[in-house]
Every structure is written in C-alpha cells, then in structure tokens.
Regions:
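Hydrophobic transmembrane alpha-helices of multi-pass small-molecule transporters
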Residues: 37-173, 189, 272-273, 277, ...
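Juxtamembrane and boundary regions of transmembrane helices in multi-pass small-molecule transporters
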Residues: 2-3, 7-80, 223, 232-291
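Hydrophobic alpha-helical transmembrane segments of multi-pass integral membrane proteins
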Residues: 12, 181-219, 223, 227, ...
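Cytoplasmic-side transmembrane-helix entry/capping segments in multi-pass membrane proteins
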Residues: 1-2, 142-151, 208, 212
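Hydrophobic alpha-helical segments of integral membrane proteins
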Residues: 2, 143-144, 167, 171-179, ...
Length: 291
C-alpha cells in the first residue's frame, strides 16, 4: 500500500492529485508540469521511503497473523481503484496489444508533441483498446473515474469564480497575513503541505488537491513566487496518504488481509508523512525555484 501511494507520484497519471494540480495551472494560464516532471520529486521520495522501510520503518510494521478476506470490502476497494476482474480469462495477444498501446500513449505524453496533446493521446489509447477488443465498451465505461472527472471539472469553475470574485485573493491575504510580513515561500510551502497532507488522511486525495490547488495559486501570486513549487507540494502531500485506512484504496485493500488496526496505520504512517514533508520542502525548491 505504501509503495502504491509513493510510486504514483512519479508520473502525471500515477495519482489523481498530479492531474488536478496540472489542470489548475493550465486553467490559470500558467506553465504546466510535464508528464515525467513529477519524477524529479517522485523518484527521490520513493528511494527515501524505501530506505526508511528497509531499516527503521520495518520495526514499526505490525506482526499480525493474516486476517480473513472480506470479499465485499476487497471488491469495493478494487472497484474504487479501477482494478479489473481477476477471474476473467486472459488473452496473451490482447495483453501484447494493450501493452503496445500503453507504450505508445506514454511515449506521446513524454515527448509532449504539439500536435498530440496529453488528452488526445489518452483518449486515442482508450479508443484503440476498445477497437482492438482489449476492452469491451461496458468495461471501458466502468473504468472511467467519474469522481475525478467531475471534481476536476468543478475545480475549473471554482478556480475561475475565485479569481473573478476576489475570493482567492481574500483567502491568500488571510493566510499570508497570519504568517507576518513578507513570509518566506519555504514557510508557506511547508504549511500548505501540512494542510494538504492532514486533509488527505480523512478525505479523498483528489478532493483535497482540488480544494487547495486554486488557493495555492492565489497564495503564491500574493507573495510573488512561482506557483509551480507550491502546487507540486500540494499535489505530493495529497498523495502521501499513509496514516489512516480510509485515506486511499490501497490502504483499504490491505486492511482485512493484513488484519491491521487503525493504530497500525497511524504508527507506520505518521513518520512517513513527516519524512515526506521534510524531503519535499528541501527537494522541491531545487527543481522548481520560487523565483
């Protein structure tokens, strides 16, 4: 579960918050993140957490006997995570075709071709999967994460409304004012990371990113710094959902089989959240300077 959460931060499509913060920048008319740009923070973060879990962190892991599989809970978590039916027969030909389609889509996204935008590459790949028979139409429809789509669409409207009405500036002025005159961008980034990270433990990481992304842009513009490092911190913080079983589908999926308790997640997750917080505050400004 920990590896799934951290590994998703390496690419734009690895986790919904990455897409959300990229869309927020595009809506504001600002330069956006590239497909693999998230790897600059995602890979170091993955290595740091891997080393921690292999050394000190493993001592914190619970040593429970395996629990009984709650099939309903597992199936619900799989559906939320977009997993396919394990009992369906597998076709090697379709596996190769779908693999080639995925490689083609990723290459197009990585090259950032002006004639093939990210959304065009993604939709084309999905259509090819249906045309080639790798997916049935109903399976493709069921695989769409409607929550993310509607949250993303709603976020665009909210961001525009906050800009037009001045609500974004009001919130930014309030937050900045609480930190004194001329607050450091490092301090702002650290505080916003904590807010996003705490929220994502108790609500969808997609929702927390959608809620804070427009506010993060307003705050960055208020203090005169580049919004990209602030948005990157918000997005990564929303994906560092380790401390509760309901934070992300991977956490929920292993709850029953691992026979874990709520306190197990807190014991293992809180140190990981603090480590990721310190690492991001140090690493993010290196690749995305504030000025």
């Amino acid at each position: 579960a920990i590896a799934a959460n951290v590994g998703g931060t390496i690419t734009m499509i690895g986790t919904p918050p990455n897409v959300i913060v990229t869309g927020a920048l595009a809506t504001a008319g600002l330069p956006t993140f590239g497909f693999f740009e998230f790897a600059y923070i995602g890979i170091p973060l993955s290595v740091i957490i891997l080393v921690w879990m292999l050394t000190i962190g493993r001592r914190m892991l619970p040593a429970h006997n395996a629990g009984e599989m709650d099939e309903e809970a597992v199936q619900a978590a799989k559906e939320e995570a977009g997993a396919s039916d394990d009992k369906a027969p597998k076709s090697k030909t379709k596996m190769w075709i779908s693999g080639l389609i995925m490689v083609g889509v990723v290459v197009c996204m990585a090259l950032e071709l002006p004639t093939v935008p990210l959304q065009t590459a993604a939709v084309t790949g999905a259509i090819l999967c249906v045309i080639t028979g790798c997916l049935k139409e109903k399976e493709a429809y069921a695989g769409i994460d409607w929550v993310t789509i509607f949250l993303f669409a709603g976020m665009l409207s909210v961001a525009t409304a906050m800009e037009k009405t001045g609500a974004g500036k009001l919130i930014a002025d309030t937050v900045v004012g609480m930190m004194g005159a001329n607050p450091s961008p490092y301090l702002l980034t650290a505080v916003l990371f904590l807010i996003s990270n705490v929220l994502t433990q108790f609500m969808s990481n997609t929702a927390s990113a959608a809620l804070l992304a427009p506010i993060g842009i307003s705050i960055a513009q208020e203090v005169g710094c580049d919004p990209k490092p602030v948005l990157m911190a918000l997005g990564i913080a929303a994906s560092m959902a380790f401390a509760t079983p309901m934070a992300t589908p991977p956490n929920t999926l292993v709850l029953g089989p691992g026979n874990f308790t709520f306190n197990d997640y807190v014991k293992v997750g809180v140190p990981l959240c603090l480590i990721s917080w310190v690492a991001c505050v140090i690493i993010i400004p290196i690749f995305w300077p504030f000025h």
